[in-house]
Curated annotation (Swiss-Prot):
It comes from Bos taurus. Sulfotransferase that utilizes 3'-phospho-5'-adenylyl sulfate (PAPS) as sulfonate donor to catalyze the sulfate conjugation of estradiol and estrone. Is a key enzyme in estrogen homeostasis, the sulfation of estrogens leads to their inactivation. Also sulfates dehydroepiandrosterone (DHEA), pregnenolone, (24S)-hydroxycholesterol and xenobiotic compounds like ethinylestradiol, equalenin, diethyl stilbesterol and 1-naphthol at significantly lower efficiency. Does not sulfonate cortisol, testosterone and dopamine. May play a role in gut microbiota-host metabolic interaction. It catalyses: estrone + 3'-phosphoadenylyl sulfate = estrone 3-sulfate + adenosine 3',5'-bisphosphate + H(+); (24S)-hydroxycholesterol + 3'-phosphoadenylyl sulfate = (24S)-hydroxycholesterol 3-sulfate + adenosine 3',5'-bisphosphate + H(+); 17beta-estradiol + 3'-phosphoadenylyl sulfate = 17beta-estradiol 3-sulfate + adenosine 3',5'-bisphosphate + H(+); 3beta-hydroxyandrost-5-en-17-one + 3'-phosphoadenylyl sulfate = dehydroepiandrosterone 3-sulfate + adenosine 3',5'-bisphosphate + H(+). It is an enzyme of class 2 (transferase). The gene is SULT1E1. This is Sulfotransferase 1E1. The active site is at H108 (proton acceptor). Homodimer. Inhibited by estradiol. It holds the Pfam family Sulfotransfer_1. Substrate binds at K106, S107, H108. Keywords: Cytoplasm, Lipid metabolism, Lipid-binding, Phosphoprotein, Steroid-binding, Transferase. Belongs to the sulfotransferase 1 family.
Length: 295
C-alpha cells in the first residue's frame, strides 16, 4: 500500500451502516434536506456501472442532439453529483441549488439514503445496473487512480471487501436489489449496462419514451455517435482529464478504461471466480433480478 495514501479508516466512515467517504458524511445533512423539483431527473447507479455514459446520453436528449452544447462544460457540472462534497471541484447540493430547471442529478445512493423529496415530488429516476464482476474490476481501478483513496492490498483483497460490502456505497447486492424493487414504480426506469452495450439504439429509444421525448432517426444517430466509448474517452468534457493528478491520476489508470462486458475474465482467478459465484448465489437467492456476464 502506498505510504502517501491514508488508511481506509482515515478516509471512510459509516452512514446508515453503509461505508461512505467521511467528507460526504460531514455534509450529508444538506443532502437529506435537499429540495427536489418536480421536473428533476435523477440518474442512480452503483459506482462504475456506466454513470457517465448514461449522463451524457441524457444530456444529449435534453439538448436535442446538440453536441457543441454538451461540450460547453464538463459532465460533473452539467450533471452534479448530489452527495459529493469536495473542497475544490464538486459540491453537489450547492451546484444543484444554483441550477436552473430542468436539472439532471447524479447519485450513487441506495434507496434508503436518497432524499425523500425526490419521492414526494414524484421525480423520474433512472437506475443503471451492471453485472457485479465487471463492476468490481472497474471499481478496483478507480480506487487505484483516485489519489486520496487508500489502495487495497491486491485485487483479491478488494474483491473480498466488495463481497462483504466494505467498499464505498456498501453492498452491490443490497443496492441493486433495493432499486430493482423500486422499479415497480412507473417513475423508475431500471436499465442494464449489458443491454446498452448490445443494442444501444433500443435503449436510447426506451429512454426517449420514458422522458416523453420525440424520437427521430437523426437524433438517435447523433446520440449514439457522440456517446460511443471512444468518443467519450477522447472528449475532455466527459473523460475527467480536466481534474488534476492530485484528484484523479490517469497515469495510474484512465477514468474511461475499457467499458467492455466480460473484462472480469482477465482479472479473476478460477478459485476467486468460484468463491464469488458461491457468494453471489447466496446473496441473490430469491431475487428475480438476472444479469449477464457476457454478451
Amino acid at each position: 500500500m502506498s505510504s502517501s495514501k491514508p488508511s481506509f479508516s482515515d478516509y471512510f466512515g459509516k452512514l446508515g451502516g453503509i461505508p461512505m467517504y467521511k467528507k460526504f458524511i460531514e455534509q450529508f445533512h444538506n443532502v437529506e434536506e435537499f429540495e427536489a423539483r418536480p421536473d428533476d431527473l435523477v440518474i442512480v447507479t452503483y459506482p462504475k456501472s456506466g454513470t457517465t455514459w448514461l449522463s451524457e446520453i441524457i444530456c444529449m436528449i435534453y439538448n436535442n442532439g446538440d453536441v457543441e452544447k454538451c461540450k460547453e462544460d464538463v459532465i460533473f457540472n452539467r450533471v452534479p453529483y448530489l452527495e459529493c462534497s469536495t473542497e475544490h471541484v464538486m459540491k453537489g447540493v450547492k451546484q444543484l441549488n444554483e441550477m436552473a430547471s430542468p436539472r439532471i442529478v447524479k447519485s450513487h445512493l441506495p434507496v434508503k439514503l436518497l432524499p425523500v423529496s425526490f419521492w414526494e415530488k414524484n421525480c423520474k429516476i433512472i437506475y443503471l445496473s451492471r453485472n457485479a464482476k465487471d463492476v468490481v474490476v472497474s471499481y478496483y481501478f478507480l480506487i487505484l487512480m483516485v489519489t486520496a483513496i487508500p489502495d487495497p492490498d491486491s485485487f483479491q483483497d478488494f474483491v473480498e471487501k466488495f463481497m462483504d460490502g466494505e467498499v464505498p456505497y456498501g453492498s452491490w447486492f443490497e443496492h441493486t436489489k433495493s432499486w430493482w424493487e423500486k422499479s415497480k414504480n412507473p417513475q423508475v426506469l431500471f436499465l442494464f449496462y449489458e443491454d446498452m452495450k448490445e443494442n444501444i439504439r433500443k435503449e436510447v429509444m426506451k429512454l426517449l419514451e420514458f422522458l416523453g421525448r420525440k424520437a427521430s432517426d437523426e437524433l438517435v444517430d447523433k446520440i449514439i455517435k457522440h456517446t460511443s466509448f471512444q468518443e467519450m474517452k477522447n472528449n475532455p468534457s466527459t473523460n475527467y482529464t480536466t481534474l488534476p493528478d492530485e484528484v484523479m491520476n490517469q497515469k495510474v489508470s484512465p477514468f474511461m478504461r475499457k467499458g467492455d462486458v466480460g473484462d472480469w475474465k482477465n482479472h479473476f482467478t478460477v478459485a476467486l471466480n468460484e468463491k464469488f459465484d458461491m457468494h453471489y448465489e447466496q446473496q441473490m437467492k430469491g431475487s428475480t433480478l438476472k444479469f449477464r456476464t457476457k454478451i
